[in-house]
């Protein structure tokens, strides 16, 4: 048998080196424990999202990263192994592992996150009157004992009322802050930006599917405020959902009453109360029951109703 000895483990990102000098026994799991202080490191933002995208193009400062499918590991370790008289070094990333009772061992990249994230509930708010609207900001703590001052910065012509001070005592604790926003006639279109303790804050978005590693990114905490002078006709709209669009929320923001319907709601006695029916984005492409739904909607049109079909693709 070949004698194998692990001499030390190190990490340049952590500025850490741990001397082991221990012989490894054949077919025996060796657990090595050590404590270290993690220095301040950049958050785990996908490299192509570090700068704001511009109409589908991305700005990447480090040209060597272009084409790489994912970020290099946030933290890597090196271990020096001695085989008799030969010495080799192996590198391996720090990863998070958990045991699932059904799927077995699951791995995901080690993520460095901000201490606090702030997610605004909608990407855009439309105002068609001077009536106030509620904007919800969800604060989440990634470590214990976090408190601070929340600040919302809006363009000229907008007034905001909200609680500024907050406390998050435990890791993963969440707090929803409701801000009341009112537009004036001089309100300018622009971004509502979220600051915590004077610093621009980031949100947290997660993509989690079984067939790919979990993906996270940290967009700027902000939403768009738009004041438009709209002359509305009608009040009540029926909406049949399409491919993940957010049109219903935007219509509600400008004062329409929106009901989300499915096929069981399409009786003529029910549809007659609506001023219009709106089909969601690519509804005709993705809804397998569209061939059976459309005759009911066209009958509604024959009876004097208004049907609006949004974007669809041709096959």
Which stretches of residues belong to each language-model region?
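Helical hinge/lid and interdomain linker segments adjacent to catalytic or ligand-binding clefts
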Residues: 236-315
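Long beta-sheet-rich domains in secretory-pathway and surface-associated proteins
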Residues: 1-226, 231-232
């Amino acid at each position: 048998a070949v004698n194998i000895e692990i001499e030390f483990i190190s990490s340049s990102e952590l500025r850490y080196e741990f001397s082991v000098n221990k012989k490894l026994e054949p077919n025996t799991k060796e657990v090595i424990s050590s404590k270290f202080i993690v220095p301040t490191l950049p958050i785990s933002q996908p490299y192509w999202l570090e700068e704001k995208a511009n109409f589908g193009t991305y700005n990447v400062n480090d040209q060597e990263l272009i084409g790489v499918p994912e970020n290099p590991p946030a933290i890597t370790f090196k271990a020096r192994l001695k085989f008799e008289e030969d010495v080799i070094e192996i590198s391996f990333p720090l990863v998070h592992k958990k045991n699932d009772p059904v799927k077995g061992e699951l791995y995901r990249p080690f993520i460095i996150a901000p201490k606090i994230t702030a997610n605004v509930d909608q990407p855009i708010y439309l105002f068609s009157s001077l009536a106030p609207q509620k904007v919800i900001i969800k604060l989440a703590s990634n470590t214990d004992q976090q408190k601070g001052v929340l600040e919302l910065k809006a363009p000229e012509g907008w007034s905001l009322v909200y609680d500024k001070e907050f406390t998050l005592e435990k890791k993963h604790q969440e707090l929803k802050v409701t801000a009341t926003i009112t537009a004036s006639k001089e309100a300018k279109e622009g971004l509502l930006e979220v600051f915590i303790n004077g610093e621009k804050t980031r949100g947290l978005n997660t993509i989690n599917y079984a067939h790919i590693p979990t993906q996270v990114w940290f967009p700027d905490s902000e939403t768009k405020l738009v004041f438009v002078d709209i002359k509305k006709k009608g009040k009540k709209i029926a909406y049949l959902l399409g491919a993940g669009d957010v049109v219903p929320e935007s219509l509600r923001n400008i004062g329409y009453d929106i009901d989300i319907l499915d096929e069981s709601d399409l009786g003529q006695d029910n549809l007659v109360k609506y001023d219009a029916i709106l089909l969601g984005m690519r509804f005709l492409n993705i809804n397998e029951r569209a061939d059976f739904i459309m005759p009911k909607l066209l009958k509604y049109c024959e009876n004097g109703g208004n049907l609006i079909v949004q974007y669809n693709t041709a096959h």
